[in-house]
Every structure is written in C-alpha cells, then in structure tokens.
Design a protein with these regions (language model features):
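Hydrophobic/aromatic residues located in beta-strands of well-ordered beta-sheets
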Residues: 18, 88, 121-123, 154
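Metal-dependent phosphoester-hydrolase catalytic domains
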Residues: 41, 99, 110-121, 129-235
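Active-site metal-binding loops of divalent metal-dependent hydrolases
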Residues: 91-93, 126-127, 225
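Structured beta-strand-rich core segments of catalytic domains in phosphoester-bond hydrolases
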Residues: 1-89
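Short, solvent-exposed aromatic-acidic interface loops
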Residues: 49-57, 93-94, 161-163, 211-216
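Short, glycine/acidic-enriched loop or turn micro-motifs at the edges of active sites
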Residues: 2, 95, 129
C-alpha cells in the first residue's frame, strides 16, 4: 500500500499499530511492506527494513532485472500473554524480473538467518511467483543446488496446515470475478495462479490456512485475496 492507504487502514483499525517505510526513499515515498499488529497483544522489540537488491541497505536501490524497487520490512515481537518471541518478515517480490525473484529469495533467506537466528519466523507477502518457479523452490529448499541445511528454508503454510486450506486456491484475480470463477471451476492448475504465501519455520505450528474470496459491498477489497493462517508457537 501507499502511505495514504496505510493511514486509512490505521484509522480503520484503532486496536492496531503499524511499522514500515516507503520503498522509494526509505521514508514515505512509494509502496510500503507495512506490518500491522495488535498493540494490546504484541510488543515490538526491534524492527527494520531492507531492499531486495545487491545493496540491501541502500534506500531505493533497484535489484537485478527488477522493474520496480522492492522492500522487506521485519519485526521482532513479544507476545504479552505468553512471553513467546518471534520474527515476522513482510515482503513484495518483483512482478517482472525472474532473476530478481530468485535472487530476492536467496537474499531473504540469508537475512532471515542473520536477523532471526533460531527464533520462530513467519514470512508473508506477495511473491509474484508460482510454485514451480525458481524463487518458490529456493524458499522451500527444493531448488537445485539449494543448501541441505533445512534451517535455511521455509515451509509453506498452505501445506503445513493441520486442517487444510479454507476457501479459494486462487490468490490473485485482478478484480475480475469471471477470472476468479473460471480458475476455480475449470480445474485450473492452482500452482500457476497462487502467488501470495505465508511461510513458517522454527517451531511454528499451522492450525488452519485460508484464502478468502469474499466481497464487501459487492466488490473485492483488493486485486489479491487475503491469505490468512491460525498458528501456534510450539517450542
């Protein structure tokens, strides 16, 4: 979302606080990979952002063959009720550059390892890539040449869910109801149309996963369907 959209969400969600920066300048310009969190339940212990590029600490840096500047925002949270700590990374991969997608996946995994260590980790975002893409395979450790250390890789909550997936299998529809309906009813290979993911590792148990395709006042609230999950930190 852009800053005005972040502000709208903030006004509509008074029980939530948020963190993040604009991807174009590291301040307010451009899209955010903002993280909203329930402030009565979670305490932010530390947070930051990095760019999906060869120079991840340089604000506004464009990576590889990407068409747009891309960013990841992360935070370390403490659950005020249980005392459990975990990290959440929210990202948005490029929609054009295949090399950028794969390199972004490698960078993201490296940053997660460096920043979060052995803490429980949740990764959310629009990855703009399908399950048979190199980027997805890197994220899940299935790519050729991937390191064998399983701690470096993530698990797709869609498959880890103890109670399966609720709702749609399409996460992007572009506001087009007919496309959504055709993809669901005609047996379209969902691996080619699911591009939004929740990944987990290090003691995260996924109870439920869902892709919600409901409308609000007769209209989809976004060109992507919300992807949600119920999780438990089990360690």
């Amino acid at each position: 979302p852009l800053r005005n959209q972040v502000d709208d969400l903030s006004n509509l969600l008074p029980e939530y606080a948020w963190l993040g920066i604009g991807r174009e300048d590291g301040k307010t310009r451009g899209e955010y990979a903002a993280i909203f969190y329930r402030k009565g339940r979670l305490e932010v212990l530390e947070s930051g952002s990095f760019w999906l590029s060869e120079t991840p600490d340089v604000p506004g840096s464009l990576g590889w063959d990407a068409a747009c500047v891309r960013i990841t925002t992360w935070a370390r949270f403490k659950d005020k009720c249980t005392g459990n700590e975990f990290f959440l990374f929210n990202t948005h991969f490029d929609h054009v550059g295949i090399t950028a997608q794969a390199e972004s996946a490698c960078l993201l995994l490296k940053q997660i390892k460096d920043i979060a260590g052995d803490f429980p980790v949740i990764v959310t975002g629009d990855f703009n890539c399908v399950e048979n893409s190199e980027a997805y395979r890197i994220m899940t450790g299935a790519a050729s040449g991937s390191q064998k250390d399983e701690t470096d890789h993530m698990v797709d909550a869609f498959y880890a869910s103890l109670h399966g997936n609720h709702g749609a299998v399409v996460s992007f529809h572009g506001f087009d109801e007919e496309i959504q309906k055709a993809k669901e009813e005609n047996g379209c290979d969902f691996e080619r149309i699911k591009i939004d993911y929740i990944f987990v590792k290090n003691g995260i148990k996924v109870l439920q996963h869902g892709i919600l395709d409901e409308k609000f006042n007769g209209r989809y609230p976004s060109d992507h369907s919300p992807v949600v999950s119920d999780i438990v930190i089990d360690r």
